[in-house]
Every structure is written in C-alpha cells, then in structure tokens.
Curated annotation (Swiss-Prot):
Primary location: mitochondrion
PROSITE patterns: SAM_MT_TRM5_TYW2
Name under which the protein is recorded: tRNA (guanine(37)-N(1))-methyltransferase
GO function terms (MF aspect): tRNA (guanine(37)-N1)-methyltransferase activity; tRNA methyltransferase activity
Function summary: Specifically methylates the N1 position of guanosine-37 in various cytoplasmic and mitochondrial tRNAs. Methylation is not dependent on the nature of the nucleoside 5' of the target nucleoside. This is the first step in the biosynthesis of wybutosine (yW), a modified base adjacent to the anticodon of tRNAs and required for accurate decoding.
InterPro entries: MeTrfase_TRM5/TYW2 (IPR030382), SAM-dependent_MTases_sf (IPR029063), TRM5-TYW2-like_MTfase (IPR056743), TRM5/TYW2-like_N (IPR056744), tRNA_Gua_MeTrfase_euk (IPR025792)
Binding-site positions, S-adenosyl-L-methionine: 240, 278-279, 306-307, 338
Reactions that this protein is recorded to catalyse: guanosine(37) in tRNA + S-adenosyl-L-methionine = N(1)-methylguanosine(37) in tRNA + S-adenosyl-L-homocysteine + H(+)
Membership in a protein family: Belongs to the class I-like SAM-binding methyltransferase superfamily. TRM5/TYW2 family.
Length: 457
C-alpha cells in the first residue's frame, strides 16, 4: 500500500502506479483506541464496526463497473472489496475519497445503469486479521516514544533489536510479527551487544520455535547456517553486492573474516580464486557447506584461523607466488576485512609481511592488492575519523595514489557510522615494519625541528 500525500483531496491514480489511500490516516479504519498500551495480545479486542460507502450492482454489471471505481476500492488485509450478496455484488469503497454519490464518476456509472440508488453506507466488521503488523503495533505501542522502527528477516526468523522502553511489549511484538509476516516461525531479540570471541549475536527467543537453522538468499545466492552461532546481517547485502560486482573472473579474493561466505561464495561462483578464512568453527563449517551447496569448491580454499594468522600464513604464501610468477596487470587482487569493530587492528599484519629480498625482483608495473577494510567511527566527522583509524593502525599515510575511496556503508547509531576504506598496499608497506616506519617519521620530525631551531638562532 502506497502513501498518498493528501488524503482530503481526490487523487489522480496513474496506470503505472497503483496508489491507495492510507488507512491509518482514517480514524474509522484504525484499530480501537482501547488497545493502546496492551502488553498481552488479545486478538478479540481489535473487533470494531465501521460504516463504509458501497455500491451494490447486479452480478452481470460488475466487470463494466469495476474499472470505473477501482481507484476508490477499500484495501485492507484479508478483506475482499467485492463480495457476493444474494444475486448481486457489493463493492466496498474507501471512506476518504468517497463521501457520497457525487464523489464517484457519476456520469460514467450512469451509462452503465448504476445510479444513486445503488449507493449506500454499510456496516463492516473489522478484526485483528484486517490490519498489518505495522498498523497493529502503531495502535498498541506508546505514542510518546519511538515505536518499532525496523527488524531483519533471515529465512523464517525475524530479528529485533528492541530499545528498553519497548521491552515490556516484546511478547506482544513477537506474536504480532509471527502472525503477520509470511513464513515467519521464530522471533528473536538481540539480548546484548556483540562482545564474544566469535562476534555473533546473543539472542533471546520471544516468540515461536527455537529453530535457528535458516535458509536464505542474498543477491540470488542461497545460504544456509545456524543464525544463533554465526554472524549474518541482511542489511549488508547491498555492500556485499558492491564488492562482488568489482570482481571479474580470474580475479583473486582474500577474505580475512569470511563468516559463512557472503563475499566469498558469490566471488567463487564468478570463478574468482578465493581464499576464505574465519575464526569461528561454526562459521567455517557453514562456509564449507555453502561452498559445496553452490558448487564452487574448485574455486575456493577455506581455513579456520585467527585473521592475523591467516594473513601471515595462507595469504602471504599465495600472494607471494602470484606477485612473483604471474602478470598482475591482467587481473585484480582484493582483500576484504569485514569485522568493523576491530578489523583495523589487523592492518599492521601487512607491514613487513615480506623481506625486501623476496620482492626485489618484481617488475616495476606490478599491481599490489586492494584492501577493503570496514570500520565503525563515532563522532562528528566520521569520514575523517575512520581515515585516521586506518592510517594509525596501518602506520602509513594514504595519499591519492593509494587511497581508492572511503565509502559510507550504513548508520549504526546516532553519530556512529560504518565505512569501507579501500586502499592499495605498496611495496614499502609490505617490506617495512610499522615500528620502523613510525621511528623513521619521528626521526624526520626531530631533524626538522632541530633545523628550524638552528635557522632561528
């Protein structure tokens, strides 16, 4: 149902877009005011009788009349606006645009032998089933504070992150969502912040079955996993798609914090060469499962290690072989680091990853990997803050030749944003330890200070 800007005016309905009048702006079509503050769902309390305009026409005329009144039909959940009554049909109309007979295209209707005698108002019983989840919750939850603004769907699970003032209503919210959302069997609430080793959500079951093994699709790719034991955020699907679209067949992807594979599996399906890693044994198990399910095992190697260990072992070995034995100008090499709470802390693992001798014979036109690291930033100028975080942990400044972009991903909380910082690794980064670079910079600053003092004397 689309929102109409002015309910008091008759609205022109285009053939391309089907706009209907918003029922929640019409008091008569709202749930009873008596349900406000309800904490235990009582579906029978939502019953009410309303009067709505109607046309009653012979059955033989319905097909000719419907195109004339289609834009005025009363649209509600589980309500058929055209109903059989004896040998005729009752067409229920929306009370906002239709106040009386003259609100309708009377001349066109009269040509079909429908006149004012066919128009009247009828009693209509509305029930819990006739309102959407949003309409039910809007009528129940307190008006003085923000209601339920969003939730995530992962397969048959609805995942909430309720604020404190909504916790007394959590059972009701869970029941309403399970009732109203298609194929929803389980409703959970985020019980605490993500602070465990494996960075997965701590969940509280508030309604439905304690079944957390889900099947879902992201950007056309099927995934299966236990939502209670791994990290999965459907709000990142667009970002996953952005990265995968950057990749071409035969490109290389090193996925340091792969999870169950939202970057790695689509990349492997595109016939990229993928090395994927995750510390969580459950994520690793489902990563393997999803690779097998999507028939991309030949294109992906998987490991179950700490991200730093993966960088200094698998990534180091594979990248060295590619840099030394292949033409890196013919394909792209990408490194994804999607662990925004701490991924930047792993950037120093790239510093001094190789000795100068190991990379001494590389051609001058060698193409080094592009790193896509995700991070949270909290404050006023979050874009600048996230750049500083990356440069500080990397121990290097990112000039215009190295920095590929700082891209906003999503707002997480007030003044807290998630970003992707994309940058090129360089020969200097890969062959110089972070501590050496910092010492060199400090020494240069001290030399400059001494020189300045000498000039002043």
């Amino acid at each position: 149902m689309f929102i109409v800007s002015r309910l008091k005016d008759l609205t022109i309905i285009t053939n391309r877009l089907r706009h209907y009048f918003r029922n929640m702006d019409v008091k008569e079509l709202q749930p009873p005011s008596s349900v406000r503050g309800m904490q235990e769902l009582q579906r029978e309390q939502f019953r009410k009788i309303v009067q709505v305009p109607r046309l009653r026409v012979p059955e033989s005329q319905v097909q000719r009349v419907m195109p004339l009144v289609k834009k005025f039909l009363l649209k509600m959940e589980h309500l058929h606006p055209v109903r059989a009554v004896d040998q005729s049909r009752e067409i229920l109309l929306h009370p906002t645009p239709v106040k009386n007979w003259d609100s309708l295209p009377t001349e066109d209707l009269q040509r079909q032998k429908v006149n004012a005698e066919n128009f009247s108002f009828a009693d209509l019983e509305l029930r819990y089933e006739n309102w959407s989840a949003n309409e039910i919750l809007k009528s129940v939850l307190p008006t003085e504070e923000e209601g339920l603004t969003s939730y995530s769907r992962i397969g048959h699970i609805a995942h909430l992150n309720l604020r404190d003032h909504l916790l007394p209503y959590k059972q009701l919210i869970g029941q309403v969502l399970r009732d109203k959302l298609p194929n929803c069997r389980t409703v959970v609430n985020k019980a605490s912040s993500i602070d465990n080793t494996y960075r997965n959500f701590q969940l509280e079951l508030i309604c439905g079955d304690p079944d957390y093994q889900v099947e879902t699709k992201e950007n056309g790719v099927p995934f299966e996993f236990d939502f209670s034991k791994v990290y999965w955020n459907p709000r990142l699907s667009t970002e996953h798609e952005r990265i995968v679209k950057m990749l071409k067949s035969d490109d290389v992807l090193y996925d340091v914090f792969a999870g169950v594979g939202p970057f790695s599996i689509p990349a492997a399906k595109k016939r990229c060469h993928v090395l994927a890693n995750d510390l969580n044994p459950e994520s690793f198990r489902w990563l393997q499962h999803n690779a097998k399910r999507n028939k991309c095992l030949p294109n992906i190697k998987m490991s179950n290690k700490d991200g730093r260990q993966f960088i200094v072992e698998e990534l180091r070995e594979d990248l060295l072989k590619r840099l030394c034995t292949t033409d890196t100008t013919t394909y792209g090499i990408h490194i994804t680091m999607n662990l925004p709470a701490m991924a930047v802390e792993f950037l120093d693992a790239f510093r001094g990853l190789y000795s100068a001798d190991e990379l001494a014979q590389l051609p001058t036109n060698v193409c080094y990997p592009t790193v896509h690291v995700y991070s949270f930033a909290k404050g006023e100028n979050t874009k600048e803050l996230v750049r500083q975080l990356v440069e500080s942990n990397l121990g290097a400044s990112l000039d215009e030749n190295l920095l590929q972009g700082i891209n906003f991903v999503r707002n997480v909380a007030p003044n807290k944003d998630m970003y992707r910082v994309s940058f090129k690794l360089s020969l200097n980064m890969l062959t110089t330890l972070k501590e050496v670079e910092v010492t060199r910079k400090r020494y240069a600053e001290e030399e400059l200070e001494v020189a300045t003092k000498v000039k002043c004397v």
